[in-house]
Amino acid sequence: MAALRRALHVATLAAGARGALAGSLAGSCPADHRLWDKLHSDTRAGSVPTFDWFFGYEEAQGFLLPLLKKSQAACPLRVLDVGCGTSSLCTGLYTRCPHPVDVLGVDLSPVAVAHMKSLLEGGQDGKPLCPGHPASQLHFVQADAQNLESVASSGSFRLVLDKGTWDAVARGGWPGAYQLLSECFRVLSPQGTLIQFSDEDPDVRVPCLEQGSPGCTVMVQELGPFGGITYFAYLVQGSL
């Protein structure tokens, strides 16, 4: 997929020295956790505690915070980040969101999950991360985003975030991508919203989402440009 290859190129430039790894990802199965373990191990070797595909919480907060404020029907609002990796999205929501949130980050890679748990408990400077709201919570669990039965019950999240995970899974074939979409909808509450962040053009992504979520509303909002690249937030709402 051109979008993922482009994102990998940008990510490699940002990371500084991972060209060989990006090539490995382009030719490997995204469902193989060993590939992601290698990626996240290399990330941990650097001085930056988190690594983001596309963009991080800093860029996303202007879009997310108004949605969280508007959606405050239950406190704290439950948020799931599928394929969280070592992104700053979960930690940013936990430490900087003024609204109460209960955030769960799941990832296939045990290396990524262990790193984020360590960051949560010890922080970059040895201090635990502090919540932006006293009622906020943050947890990380190793799990396959295509099968969340062991970690998430049906209808248990008001907001599901997917930042680049669909892009990666789709490289392994459409059945896996649509299984990911189905699982996101299973754990989403009837009033909830799935948000996919990607640089993939709406002319490509929207028909895929409409096919995989009949009866739902698919909306698109342009984000950025960040680093010279325009991104998109794909919002899918409604019960299947």
Stretches with model-predicted labels:
Residues 222-240:
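Core SAM-dependent methyltransferase catalytic element
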Residues 146-160:
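A short acidic, Gly/Pro-enriched loop at the edge of an enzyme's catalytic core
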Residues 191-198:
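Conserved beta-strand signature within the Rossmann-like core of class I S-adenosyl-L-methionine
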Residues 175-190:
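A short glycine-rich, Lys/Arg-flanked "PGG" loop and its adjoining helix->strand segment in the class I
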Residues 2-50, 54-59:
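N-terminal, positively charged/glycine-rich alpha-helical extensions of SAM-dependent methyltransferases
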